[in-house]
């Protein structure tokens, strides 16, 4: 096997159709040369850059709530172009057995008109000067003179507090084909504030990063009528943590326990307050009340040194964390506690779940957060009985205690069941090592999950913690017993959702609410090829701030299954979770937090309770405008009061300031299409569970129609007769695509889907952070056979202007593996001899086209026979870079795509061989292969899939709906 780089046949370039090259499409806007005097619209926008111990009294969330309320926490453009043909040495054509194809030279493109959808064109912004023959939107106006520009986002159409807001640029969806998917990785429209809006003028860290805190609208309507008219939602997306481990975040912490809050609204001091009375007092930006500046801001009583209050991190940074004094503690911070509830029925033992889980826990003991050596653990095995394990002090072994009374489960011992991990390490290790042997000859088919949950809750209700459940069997005995539902009679019918996706037993929700009151979270890891009623069981994590992890048809006989489950469980246990947490979001006067979405429980109208706060989920808060807003800027603040796993009480505060406007044009010009997609996803889930799946799909499509209608009526200049009905602002042009693709997601699609799979998909969509959500809706596809030579190898960090003053000068230092530019989710972007990697957020598919050249599969798989490639769930053979550079690069890309610092998900790889004209009949008739091809192809969401139309057909249907 040669280690040299090969050059695989490149697709022909065609200006009329998409090619396999990872190049962005050129729309009619870019194809036409701008002519002075020609009616047109500038195409501009923002630049894409990512950039229970004995004697301890019970203390629950109700007491914590009372204490907390007393505190009143508040009211890309692709780098490739069509000219880029990667010049590499060519293999002899005979070796490839391919018909030689003549390469068509790419047409010359005016450099000024190269693909950059958010780069304003020279002279753009004046009616009659532009491209495409589409007049500017209202608010830009015929003959409007350019005033100024804000970065790359275009000209201002309005002033907010003396600051020019983002301009509106219109595009035609029917011309933006294929859709410019690079924009899915762009940052939201910039938030334009005056330098004087912050106490530190011009501060670049005063407003929260969209990774933590973002709004669906980056210009807020100043009254409810305008918001209703816009057909756009007003909501906040909150993700307080962006890494699984505390050291991986760069959030400043105030350590002096001095916390300054408004006396009236209880808002935290932040970068947007103003000073009064010679700096002795600060005016709250939420309620306008004057408050005293703490003396500790200017004088350190311990050291006797004078301090500069303007150096305080809470005045300089939008996201900060306070170490809280005792006044913020309802009780002393509790230790981190895990109760492992393990299925030991015959199904769990025979599938290997019991052995895999105990081995994984054993290997992960060092990863459990235990900095102060206070972590506690307990183990309960479950079949038709409850098997407790008592640790005897001073003894290496454990005693098994069996409780057969599952109707009234009790703790068989007053002590030794919940023990300190550090002090009992040897005994715990021995138990986990021996655990599978205790049940290896079982024939017990029962699984009393409900009684086990109640027993675990009783064990830790006075300290709180986590119940981590591993199940391979449907709960079939005791309280919470479930039965298999009749899917065949309702699948594909309007009543499917109510019959299959709503809870079958109220026990699980009521138990979850009780757990929340006791600061207990439930996490589920479900592994079975048979029905498990995910829709019912998912209530446990949903109301306790946990998560449901679903592994259909899992078996320990498959290495890849074991690897995925083990890695995800291990990463789950290693999270630096917060304990006994509450979240409250406040806004400026005139706003009300009306609805809350995510995995938690609302204990009051605006207080979200989290027994433990995970670091891999996000939350959405819908807002309503209660009165007219007369200020140019409004403010929002999210605060998470919590205890760390190492025993500190902390408050994480996030701040966001947004301009307001009375003009619809400004609202649309700064709308965040990804955050809006998140909002509509939550509403569609709500609609599906309360009504039906067809109504949820119709809800999504009708939202697109409403937005296009209002845009056409209000924002297309003069509502030009005969104008395309599919016009929308450039910053929202991915929204119709995303909502259309959401209807084809496993959670909502009209095709028949097993109810457990659909319920798991709905559950995941309701808690995913935005980047993972978008990938689940619109999978990322990479073309590997023609990727640039730099891809799959470490890149080099180049110093940018923003980095110029940084102390950390890493210019010329190797950094992360370079990935190819994504291509559109459509077979029209593929070649029949290509190699493609599909990432849908949960799995990876490596698609080997049926006419792939032998040299390519030799380099990747070590064989020239296409049908000798191992397909399905597998891993690639590992060759060194000297043995096969291409194999090495492909594996590096797969490894990079699997990296997710804020998620525990490990994506299995599925190898799929595409069909070809000379495919052997015995291959083409393999049911597993056909099913695998259909599964992978369903990720190509722009194409027609099953009974679902293509995106082009969807746009065609929209024209008639919008024109009506």
Curated annotation (Swiss-Prot):
Segments of this protein annotated with the region Disordered: 1-48, 80-111, 792-812
GO terms, molecular function: SNARE binding; zinc ion binding
Membrane topology note: Peripheral membrane protein
Top-level taxon of the source organism: Eukaryota
Family annotation (Gene3D superfamilies): beta-sandwich domain of Sec23/24, Sec23/Sec24 helical domain, Severin, von Willebrand factor, type A domain, Zn-finger domain of Sec23/24
Comp. bias regions, Acidic residues: 799-812
Any Pfam family: Sec23_helical
Chain intervals for the UniProt region annotation (Zinc finger-like): 262-287
Sequence similarity: Belongs to the SEC23/SEC24 family. SEC24 subfamily.
Function according to Swiss-Prot or TrEMBL: Component of the coat protein complex II (COPII) which promotes the formation of transport vesicles from the endoplasmic reticulum (ER). The coat has two main functions, the physical deformation of the endoplasmic reticulum membrane into vesicles and the selection of cargo molecules.
Name under which the protein is recorded: Protein transport protein SEC24
Protein's gene: SEC24
């Amino acid at each position: 096997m040669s280690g040299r780089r090969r050059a695989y046949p490149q697709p022909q370039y065609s200006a009329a159709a998409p090619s396999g090259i990872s190049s962005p499409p050129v729309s009619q806007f870019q194809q036409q040369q701008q002519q002075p005097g020609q009616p047109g619209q500038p195409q501009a926008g923002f630049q894409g850059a990512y950039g229970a111990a004995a004697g301890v009294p019970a203390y629950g969330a109700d007491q914590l709530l009372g204490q907390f309320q007393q505190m009143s926490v508040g009211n890309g453009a692709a780098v490739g172009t069509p000219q880029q043909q990667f010049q590499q040495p060519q293999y002899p054509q005979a070796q490839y057995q391919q018909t030689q194809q003549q390469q068509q030279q790419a047409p010359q493109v005016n450099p000024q008109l190269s693909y950059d959808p958010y780069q304003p064109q020279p002279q753009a912004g004046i009616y009659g000067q532009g491209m495409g023959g589409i007049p500017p939107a209202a608010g830009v106006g015929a003959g409007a003179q350019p005033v100024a520009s804000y970065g790359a986002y275009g000209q201002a159409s309005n002033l907010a507090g003396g600051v020019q807001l983002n301009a509106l640029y219109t595009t035609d969806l029917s011309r933006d084909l294929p859709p410019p998917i690079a924009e899915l990785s762009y940052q939201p429209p910039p938030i334009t504030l005056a330098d004087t809006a912050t106490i530190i003028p011009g501060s670049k860290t005063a407003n929260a990063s969209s990774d933590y805190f973002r709004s669906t609208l980056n210009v807020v309507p100043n009254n409810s009528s305008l918001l209703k008219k816009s057909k756009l939602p007003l909501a906040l997306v909150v993700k307080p943590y962006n890494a699984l481990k505390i050291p991986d975040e760069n959030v400043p912490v105030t350590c002096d326990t001095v916390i300054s809050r408004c006396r009236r609204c209880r808002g935290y001091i932040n970068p947007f307050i103003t000073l009064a009375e010679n700096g002795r007092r600060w005016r709250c930006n939420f309620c306008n009340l004057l408050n005293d500046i703490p003396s500790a801001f200017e004088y350190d009583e311990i050291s006797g040194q004078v301090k500069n209050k303007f150096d305080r991190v809470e005045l300089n940074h939008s996201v900060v964390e306070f170490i809280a004094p005792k006044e913020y503690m309802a009780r002393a911070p509790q230790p981190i506690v895990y109760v492992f509830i393990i299925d030991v029925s015959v199904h769990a033992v025979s599938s290997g779940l019991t052995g895999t889980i105990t081995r994984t826990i054993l290997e992960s003991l060092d990863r459990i957060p235990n900095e102060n050596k206070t972590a506690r653990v307990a183990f309960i095995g479950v079949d038709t009985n409850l098997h407790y394990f008592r640790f005897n002090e001073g003894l290496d072994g454990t005693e098994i205690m069996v409780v057969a009374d599952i109707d009234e489960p009790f703790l068989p011992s007053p002590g030794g069941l919940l023990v300190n991990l550090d002090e009992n390490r040897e005994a715990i290790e021995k138990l986990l090592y021996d655990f599978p042997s205790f049940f290896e000859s079982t024939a017990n088919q029962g699984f009393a999950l409900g009684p086990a949950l109640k027993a675990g809750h009783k064990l830790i209700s006075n300290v709180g913690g986590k119940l981590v459940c591993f199940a391979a069997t449907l709960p079939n005995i005791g309280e919470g017993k479930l039965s298999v539902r009749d899917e065949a009679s309702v699948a594909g019918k309007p009543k499917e959702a109510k019959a299959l996706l709503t809870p079958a037993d109220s026990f699980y929700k009521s138990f979850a609410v009780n757990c929340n009151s006791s600061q207990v979270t439930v996490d589920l890891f479900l592994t079975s090829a048979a029905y498990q009623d995910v829709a019912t069981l998912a209530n446990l994590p949903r109301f306790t701030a946990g998560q449901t992890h679903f592994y259909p048809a899992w078996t320990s006989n498959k290495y890849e299954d074991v690897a995925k489950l083990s890695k995800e469980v291990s990463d789950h246990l290693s999270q630096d979770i917060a304990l006994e947490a509450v979240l409250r979001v406040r806004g400026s006067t005139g706003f009300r937090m009306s609805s809350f979405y995510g995995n938690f429980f609302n204990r009051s109208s605006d207080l979200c309770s989290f027994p433990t706060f995970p670091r891999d989920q996000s939350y959405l808060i819908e807002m309503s405008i209660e009165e007219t807003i007369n200020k140019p800027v409004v403010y929002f603040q999210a605060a998470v009061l919590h205890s760390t796993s190492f025993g500190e009480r902390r408050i994480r505060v996030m701040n966001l300031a947004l301009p307001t406007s009375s003009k619809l044009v400004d609202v649309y010009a700064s709308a965040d299409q990804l955050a809006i997609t998140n909002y509509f996803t939550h509403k569609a889930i709500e609609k599906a569970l309360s009504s039906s799946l067809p109504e949820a799909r119709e809800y999504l499509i009708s939202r697109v129609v409403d937005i296009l209608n209002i845009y056409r009526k209000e924002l297309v200049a003069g509502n030009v007769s005969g104008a395309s009905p599919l016009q929308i602002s450039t910053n929202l042009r991915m929204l119709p695509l995303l909502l259309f693709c959401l209807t084809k997601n496993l959670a909502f699609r009209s095709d028949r889907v097993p109810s457990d799979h659909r319920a798991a998909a709905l559950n995941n969509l309701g808690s995913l952070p935005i980047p993972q959500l978008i990938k689940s809706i619109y999978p990322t596809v990479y073309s590997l056979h023609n990727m640039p030579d730099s891809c799959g190898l470490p890149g080099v960090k180049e110093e940018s202007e923003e980095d110029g003053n940084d102390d950390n000068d890493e210019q010329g230092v190797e950094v992360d593996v370079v990935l190819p530019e994504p291509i559109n989710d459509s077979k029209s972007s593929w070649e029949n001899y290509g190699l493609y990697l599909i990432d849908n957020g949960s799995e990876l598919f490596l698609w080997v086209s049926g006419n792939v050249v032998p040299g390519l599969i030799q380099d990747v798989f070590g064989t020239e026979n296409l049908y000798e490639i191992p397909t399905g769930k597998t891993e690639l053979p590992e060759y060194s870079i000297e043995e096969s550079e291409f194999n090495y690069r492909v594996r590096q890309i797969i490894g990079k795509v699997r990296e997710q610092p804020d998620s525990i998900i490990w994506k299995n790889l599925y190898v799929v061989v595409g069909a070809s004209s000379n495919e052997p009949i015995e291959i083409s008739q393999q049911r597993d292969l056909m099913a695998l091809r259909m599964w992978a192809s369903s990720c190509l969401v722009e194409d027609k899939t099953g009974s679902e139309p293509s995106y082009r057909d969807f746009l065609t249907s929209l024209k008639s709906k919008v024109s009506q």
